[in-house]
């Protein structure tokens, strides 16, 4: 038990030290987030179903369940001059404490965020002694690009999320692009996608750019996910999920967001 605790703390510390050396600003935020009712958006209130929270006097408090969301709220209210930050700590999900390390980049141009990825990959290889086995790519504009608004009912969206092909065929017909893509192996879906989206569509450009970049850097097992639906309204672009070779519970996830704050985040569960 002692060795496990020490090993975990060492990983967090080495993460922060390494990213500090790479010119990231190390930040530390309280696990307990004090929320101001006057500043909570409708979306913030909807998230309360996912969080452990309580009210004391006239204040409401909640346990952190996502670093990106916490930093997004904070820096939206209190703008920062920081361009890229690194963090390590606990998040609470489904009543479980999970260790997470990650970064946020507030200048999310492609060259910047691919360098962020290379920094993370170096940490995975040289500190965790692991490597990326395969990548899942997606884009939060894909559903809107492939599915007509009148078909975006709760029932259909749930079927897409569940990959319920038989149900979708009844709702959309067999020849619908969503069904034609989903019936393919996820390794082949990127090729199929090009049949249904113009090559200059923003989602297509982003996915193709990342797929080519990964291939150029030796990561060739790339799956497409057309089913993902944005967990927050400000998630509007590419998202990435990287599974590691040696550990099934550690997943590197990231994505682009743009609301009151623009950025790109990458987080790894330890």
Swiss-Prot record:
Pfam families: tRNA-synt_His (PF13393). It is found in: Cytoplasm. Pathway: Amino-acid biosynthesis; L-histidine biosynthesis; L-histidine from 5-phospho-alpha-D-ribose 1-diphosphate: step 1/9. Transmembrane segments: none annotated. One of its GO terms (biological process) is L-histidine biosynthetic process. Disulfide bonds: none annotated. Keywords: Amino-acid biosynthesis, Cytoplasm, Histidine biosynthesis. This function is generally fulfilled by the C-terminal part of HisG, which is missing in some bacteria such as this one. Heteromultimer composed of HisG and HisZ subunits. Belongs to the class-II aminoacyl-tRNA synthetase family. HisZ subfamily. This is ATP phosphoribosyltransferase regulatory subunit.
